[in-house]
Regions:
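N-terminal nucleophile
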Residues: 1-416
Length: 416
């Protein structure tokens, strides 16, 4: 977990990030938290554009720091019209730099995704159903286990098939992905699933389809890196923000999707606060509540509605109109609460945000990261947010400016 945020108004955008990095140690589950991670980068020394990283700290085993600073050295002098063009340039760089991230490392990343998915799915099914009411015969039990796995992946495939392709992927990539999966997945499956030397064809078919979709289509694996591109292209007079999630690389293409809910176009009327990773405290500040409160309220109203309906039925009242009214009432309650919070919290914060100076923008961004860190400090959870906070301001006039920046060395000893 981490706490990162962008605060944007017509003048500039402020980026703030903590330094915490959480590592879990293999089978032991030991959790180590380090407070020295770099998450904000200057993408060009000549133009007003920055990049922020969250979740995984590497691209197919290559640290983002190496990839980003190599891009800046080779392409930082190139100016682009929009932030989207900077994003495309960076992705092209990732696709072409096999001397930094080799084909072997890219394929190893895909195999890691396969292995984690298989292990997670099998462990989950094992706890729920695999060892319930199995026959005594080993062969019969194995057949039932394989059938249940095949049914599970068939259901997952129905869902994944409806998902959109990763950006830049299409049906032609499915053919190549299927061939790659056939050549690489089988041994991984044999290492994880119980078997007698092979897997039945119907299970193989579902696994092939599953991993083909994982390579080509948007999915919910947590093995991604979030990249946030922020700043100004040469044709943009107001800050633009584009957030993507990168899952790996296949067939000379980066597997990524755009997170539209965490993007902001270049617009003078578009002042926003966008949190990443640890979001609850920011939402509470902006909206007056976080999502868990609304979910709890919705569940509570639904439960009370069901109890009222049950009481009516027990008294011999079976009125479909009453049931529809209760459902409508629940939606109306949620809508009124959200409208109240929007009018009394969100709009006030947004209106205030529009008039903030660069200095106040940076202070606000830093304070919101501090708020998340403090909440974890006084809770019984791991302090997965913390350490020094880096803060940068990007404006059209002044470019990328560091407000606060941690250094791993003594600046007085390194004047060169």
């Amino acid at each position: 977990m981490t706490a990162e945020i962008i605060v944007k108004n017509p003048v500039a955008c402020a980026l703030a990030a903590d330094s915490a990095m959480t590592m879990t140690g293999g089978n032991s589950g030991t959790v180590k938290i380090f407070n020295n991670a770099e998450k904000i980068y200057q993408l060009s020394k000549h133009y007003p554009v920055g990049l922020m990283v969250y979740n995984n700290a590497d691209f197919c085993g290559t640290p983002w720091e190496l990839s980003i600073r190599s891009f800046r050295k080779l392409h930082g002098h190139e100016e682009h019209s929009t932030i989207r063009d900077y994003l495309n340039s960076f992705l092209s760089f990732l696709n072409s730099t096999y001397n930094i991230t080799s084909i072997a490392k890219r394929e190893a990343k895909l195999k890691e995704i396969f292995r984690r998915y298989l292990k997670l799915n099998y462990d989950d099914l094992s706890q729920k159903t695999l060892h319930v009411a199995l026959p005594e015969s080993d062969e019969e039990a194995l057949n039932i286990i394989h059938q249940r796995l095949a049914n599970f992946y068939a259901s997952e495939n129905e869902f994944l098939e409806r998902n959109p392709f990763f950006e830049g992927f299409d049906e032609s990539d499915v053919i190549n992905a299927r061939e790659f999966v056939i050549n690489n997945y089988l041994q991984i499956a044999l290492d994880i699933f119980p078997n007698n030397g092979d897997l039945p064809e119907h299970l193989k078919t579902q696994l092939i389809n599953f991993f083909t979709f994982i390579i080509c289509k948007e999915n919910v694996t947590s093995l991604y890196s979030g990249l946030v591109f922020a700043g100004f292209g040469s044709d943009e007079y107001y800050a633009s923000i584009i957030t993507i999630q990168i899952y790996g690389s296949f067939n000379n293409k980066v597997m990524y999707k755009i997170i539209h809910g965490k993007c902001s176009k270049s617009d003078p009327d578009n002042s926003v606060i966008i949190p990443f990773a640890s979001e609850d405290e920011v939402f509470t500040f902006v909206r007056g509540f976080n999502n868990s409160i609304i979910n709890f309220m919705g569940n509570t109203v639904s439960k009370l509605s069901n109890e009222i309906l049950e009481n009516l039925r027990e008294r011999g009242v079976n009125d479909e109109i009453s049931e529809q009214k209760l459902i409508s009432l629940k939606d109306d309650i949620i809508d009124r609460v959200q409208r109240y919070c929007d009018e009394n919290f969100t709009q006030k914060v947004t209106n205030m945000l529009t008039s903030l100076s660069k200095k106040d923008l940076s202070y606000m961004a830093e304070s919101l990261v501090n708020l998340s860190a403090f909440k974890l400090k006084i809770s019984d959870s791991y302090e997965t947010v913390g350490g020094p906070i880096d803060v940068a301001i990007i404006s059209k006039t002044d470019g990328f400016v560091w407000i606060k920046r941690k250094l791993y060395f003594d600046k007085n000893l390194n004047n060169n």
